[in-house]
Amino acid sequence: MNKLKLIFAGTPDFAARHLAALLSSDHEVVAVYTQPDKPAGRGQKLTASPVKELALAHNLPVYQPASLRKEEAQAELAALGADLMVVVAYGLILPKAVLDTPRLGCINVHGSLLPRWRGAAPIQRSIWAGDAETGVTIMQMDVGLDTGAMIRKVSCPIAADETSASLYDKLAGLGPQALVDTVNAMAAGNTAAEAQDDAQANYAEKLSKEEARIDWSMEAVAIERCTRAFNPWPISWFEVAGQTVKVWQAEVVAQDHGQAAGTLLKADKQGIDIATGKGVLRLLTLQPPGKKAMSVTDLLNSRRDWFEPGTQLN
């Protein structure tokens, strides 16, 4: 097997786990690209990405262009003489000039079984849609958005209690080995890519805070999936007594209620039951303003007046 010279491009922890796998492989990472440092935390201090921190710990050259569209940035990348560029949650668009620069092109690790859930939020959208399985796809990049030919797929089930946080960890465990296997196969000239069927594609749009507002007219099953899809961000929420309350955990209670959607049916140590468009949603772990997430029992000890039966939410 030939030893390949790699450029790695990525930004969050998910990407850093893939970089770590490449650093333990037989190949040479000659440079790392990541997004510019950004303000974070209460002090809004400029903070390096997890990928940058890992790269610096391994004394790798780090490049942080605001864009790869400029000729200077493209020339700088070409001068690295890489055989292959590996892209994982980088966050910048790669123009055709960059895609064509490495001898073997650019490959991308995507958190879904393409062509399902192209786009920015595949993990969250797969949970929200009630998919039974998802996985990781490694594709040869082209100028489209997650439209490239697929080199390798690894699947995993989505558990009934899966959150975006837990599924993120699952895929971050699956992806690195699949990536190393793919790079090894490319080094040996032993890969075949399968074109995506555009007719089977759908799009995983980026999440918004407003989208996380609970619509009680939806079915309880769908709302419960939302609470898991939006955990750990932006967290599903509703308003009561003029306050915003976040929902970290809920469950579906299979019962008919005969009440208007959004009606509070009961509140006790078992949970807070809310009528929905179909079925009942039982709220289990909530976060009131300025507090940490807490059990319903703890919240009712201090705010029972918010949750009187018959109260209409939203």
Curated annotation (Swiss-Prot):
Superkingdom, taxonomy of origin: Bacteria
Originating species: Aeromonas hydrophila subsp. hydrophila (strain ATCC 7966 / DSM 30187 / BCRC 13018 / CCUG 14551 / JCM 1027 / KCTC 2358 / NCIMB 9240 / NCTC 8049)
Catalytic reactions of this protein: L-methionyl-tRNA(fMet) + (6R)-10-formyltetrahydrofolate = N-formyl-L-methionyl-tRNA(fMet) + (6S)-5,6,7,8-tetrahydrofolate + H(+)
PANTHER family: METHIONYL-TRNA FORMYLTRANSFERASE (PTHR11138), METHIONYL-TRNA FORMYLTRANSFERASE, MITOCHONDRIAL (PTHR11138:SF5)
Role: Attaches a formyl group to the free amino group of methionyl-tRNA(fMet). The formyl group appears to play a dual role in the initiator identity of N-formylmethionyl-tRNA by promoting its recognition by IF2 and preventing the misappropriation of this tRNA by the elongation apparatus.
E.C. code: 2.1.2.9
Lineage, uppermost ranks: Bacteria, Pseudomonadati, Pseudomonadota, Gammaproteobacteria, Aeromonadales
GO cellular component terms, semicolon-separated: cytosol
Name this protein carries in UniProt: Methionyl-tRNA formyltransferase
HAMAP family: Formyl_trans
